[in-house]
Amino acid sequence: ADAATAGVRKLVRLAIEKNIRLSLMPYPKHVLHYEAERRCEGIEARWNELWKIAAVVEQEARGKAGPVEVWDFHGYRDANAERVHAGKAMRERWWQDNGHFNHEVGAAAFDSIFSAGRAYGHRVDTRNFDGLVEAVERERSDFLARNPWVEPELYELARLVGAGW
């Protein structure tokens, strides 16, 4: 096992042993960030990483309901898809740029984890994993078809990065 998986396993074991509620989640990102990653690195590594985390949690829980959950806030819905440079003041935005969210995104994630409302994100386990991947890929296709601004903003971002922005 790689060092990252070993670290997650150690953390999960400790949470189970001490009966501490632990919610694991990859950092939420803006759709422009997801699209840049997808085009540069592919999407397989991201899904493989999430699968490994869900599998470790289930292995360590040994079939019992435990205090450890895996959540994913990847997606192409409103919370991750606000146009970053749409002329809004920072205090009115969910995103500072394509890699840094404001407190509204964090609050939406916490609301999904700690309340009954699940408007944002998905709880992940190995049983629902394939369905989650299919749903996100379908969501992506639909989103990109409805939002032609993504392509030019992605190219502008690449131009800025290439120019040493």
Predicted regions mapped to residue ranges:
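C-terminal regions of proteins
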Residues: 51-165
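Conserved, well-ordered alpha-helix/loop/beta-strand core segments that scaffold catalytic motifs
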Residues: 1-66
